[in-house]
Amino acid sequence: VGSEMCIRDRYTQQDGAAPQKVQIEIIRDDRPDTARLTFTNGATSATVSPDGKQVAFIARGEVFVTSADYATTKQITHTPAGESGLSFAPDNRTLAYASERNGNWQLYLAKIVRKEDPNFPNATIVEEEALLPSATVERAFPQFSPDGKELAFIEDRTRLMVVNLDTKKVRQITDGSTWYSTSGGFDYAWSPDGKWFTLEFIGNRHDPYSDIGLVSAQGNSPIINLTNSGYMSGSPRFALDGNAILFKTERYGMRAHASWGSQDDAMLVFLNQDAYDKYCLSKEDYELRKELEAEQKKAQSKDTAKGKKGSKKDAGQEKAADDDKAQVKDITVELKNMEDRMVRLTPNSSDMGSVIISKDGETLYYFAAFEGGYDLWKMDLRKKDTRLLHKMD
């Protein structure tokens, strides 16, 4: 059996003298002290929770969630890998993101464990779950469905997929033949009723000029080309309670004929004639229509209440069910003459950033750069009045 001898100190000794301890010094290369870094900018992406009380963002490849009203912030991930793509579940207590661990992008869910914890910034325990782990398939850019029961994502950078979070069953929405770039994903969005996706895609193999499409969320359906443009269109999102799709396009501004220097405009394509007719009303006619609709809704509520009998508890349950049903109104899609229901919103083309329409459909907000950096602009869609809301640069 072998043995080991460990020597702690070294000594020298001459004849007739006492042992002398040898002083040993080891010189090592300098290394910096551990530093605590504080950042107030540099986030690469961010998203707001459905209740508007939390903001999730990514800084230096890590996921953080902060309170919208206070400085309380919690770091969700602690990994050497990069994270990207953030999506809150409708319950505000689950966060989806992608992480490039072990050299492969995969989906993860972070969940607040304790029911007593109101949000992520104040949560004491946050659990992380790997969703559909795989060593060969890449999955990224997650987005929760409006009801929170499903999660959409982009697989292998080209295919739009959906997973049922209860059964873990995955279905294919697009087959990857309409997107050629493998440098990242593409923009897409759920419809408010959860039955459709709008997305940017390459139609007629006209890469890299993308169009705006509409496709069923059930899968096994072709993409409907809404724009049919020879120029770049992108950043689609649903607006006006899902009755229209807002997007950016370079068809009116300077075009990227030499692969640079293009300018964008914000546009709306209306999915049905009623939504388009409402948009085209003057401010006076629109106010009259709103009053008429309010009176009709009030009368309908009275008739419904008269026709229902039962206890207060039953009535309350029925009212809650009716409210939920009203909030999830199915979107009417009318393909005929859709090309005539497309309008340019912005008065002039620009180097444009993010674009969004207010929930009531009255105001357009967008970032645009004319001279220098981006500024925040506001446009009244009824009055066609545009003004600078905030000077950023």
Q: Model-derived features: where do they sit?
A:
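Short, small-residue-biased leader/transition segments that mark boundaries at the very start
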Residues: V1-I7
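Conserved beta-propeller blade repeats
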Residues: S3, P32-Q54, T79-A98, W105, ...
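Structural motif
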Residues: R8-R10, F64, G103-A110, R159-V162, ...
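Multi-bladed beta-propeller domains
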Residues: Q13-N41, S67-S84, K111-A140, V163-F186, ...
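Long hydrophobic segments that form regular secondary structure
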Residues: S49-A56, G61-S67, S191, G213, ...
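Short, conserved, GDST-rich strand-edge loop motifs in beta-rich repeat architectures
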Residues: I112-N119, E200-D207, K248-D264, L271-D324
